[in-house]
Amino acid sequence: MRIAILGRPNVGKSSLFNRLCKRSLAIVNSQEGTTRDRLYGEIRAWDSIIHVIDTGGVDQESTDRFQKQIHQQALAAAEEASVLLLVVDIRCGITKQDEELAKRLLPLKKPLILVMNKADSQQDLQRIHEFYGLGISDMIATSASHDKHIDLLLERIRQIAQIPVPSVEEQDAVQEDELPSEEAAISLHAFADETLFENESLSQEEASFLEELVAQTATPAPVDRPLKVALIGHPNVGKSSIINALLKEERCITDNSPGTTRDNIDVAYTHNNKEYVFIDTAGLRKTKSIKNSVEWMSSSRTEKAISRTDICLLVIDATQQLSYQDKRILSMIARYKKPHVILVNKWDLMFGVRMEHYVQDLRKMDPYIGQARILCISAKQRRNLLQIFSAIDDIYTIATTKLSTSLVNKVLASAMQRHHPQVINGKRLRIYYAIHKTTTPFTFLLFINSNSLLTKPYELYLKNTLKAAFNLYRVPFDLEYKAKPARKSN
């Protein structure tokens, strides 16, 4: 079931959307036209999921150059949804825009609820009768900003969706089911069955230390869900155009003006029976170029999108030099340790430029580019777009492959035999055991005798060895260490 939230600008649609979804997904600001594209969220209640669509404010009299596209996006959401919420400002009474929207929505013959928002006081509630003239019989007064009567709206939605209310017994059963079972726990390879790096036997103290650490490093099984892919880049490089070209529909509003996209827009798409969620983000700009609070919130949400995505697609403009902002985004992606692909958009404008020479030169411009996959594409001409899916799938397969503990130990044991650690104060680094701890982020855990015996050059040597052995050139990964506790002196 899908619910579309519609209304003229600045009536509190995004505030209501955030309340229903119980997350701050949409930017809320007193500036009209803050929301432009369709935003998707979820109501998770009654052991069910209801999809919610937030839309931009519809005002046919507005001179905003985006208004036509906002209007089209809102009507598309109304067609897509099975239940409609028309949001009005109870303090303003019925406006011409409210009347026009009601006339548009009533003929759709879908359940339609009039949400009289901003009913913050008893005096506001006395104006309910004014809205009977819209011809909508299902009416609820709310205050999204103060969380008033949202429960009544949710109950009405439940009734329309015909979702039964779970009994007390069923709720208790659900809570018990959420507890992890012994069968669901993921156990590591038994410590006793693995070959240690050195032939010398462990002391009882070392064996107890290692066995306890291994028991604490169980890794949860991967979640079966759509792959999240965020398109990141500075304004006006064509992020929204790429999504529209991939989906073959005008899903995101595009314009030549930087800053057109403000919210992070999640767009679900299925390709070759694989599910993806593309996250269209606002362009990151230099701090001094951010002119208002809406742009500041958009930029902060771009960083949040990087933190929650599985793979980043950094979009750059082929006609421009790699900018300071591009390099800043690359460092941000590296900081969050996200696998990434670089999309060089607007390649149709690069007349007479050899692609391989361009890619070689691009790799020299920033160390964070490294061995990242680089695709030269054209959203306008739909050139090389299908390569995006293969690049995403290839890197995600590597990034989510759980490596065998036995294989990790053999690779590191071989590395230590080829190049022994240096002796420091009469002692040498020992690696007792190693595991592939997690895939998100990709992390190896090494159990060692002492952190003080691990030098930076040797750590880099181990990291390069693992990178080559497991083809991790395009997957950021970390090495973590657990050192044996120092002996207590008597």
UniProtKB/Swiss-Prot annotation:
InterPro entries tied to this protein: G_ENGA (IPR031166), GTP-bd (IPR006073), GTPase_Der (IPR016484), KH_dom-like (IPR032859), KH_dom-like_a/b (IPR015946), P-loop_NTPase (IPR027417), Small_GTP-bd (IPR005225)
Keyword GTP-binding: yes
Xref: Pfam families: KH_dom-like (PF14714), MMR_HSR1 (PF01926)
A molecular-function term among this protein's GO annotations: GTP binding
Gene3D superfamilies linked: 3.30.300.20, P-loop containing nucleotide triphosphate hydrolases
Function: GTPase that plays an essential role in the late steps of ribosome biogenesis.
GO biological process: ribosome biogenesis
Similarity remark: Belongs to the TRAFAC class TrmE-Era-EngA-EngB-Septin-like GTPase superfamily. EngA (Der) GTPase family.
Domain EngA-type G: 1-165, 227-400
Lineage: Bacteria, Pseudomonadati, Chlamydiota, Chlamydiia, Chlamydiales
UniProt name for this protein: GTPase Der
Binding site for GTP 2: 233-240, 280-284, 345-348
The organism's place on the tree of life at top rank: Bacteria
Residue stretches making up the KH-like domain: 401-485
Assembly and interaction partners: Associates with the 50S ribosomal subunit.
Keyword terms of this UniProt record: GTP-binding, Nucleotide-binding, Repeat, Ribosome biogenesis
Organism: Chlamydia trachomatis serovar D (strain ATCC VR-885 / DSM 19411 / UW-3/Cx)
Amino acids binding GTP 1: 7-14, 54-58, 117-120
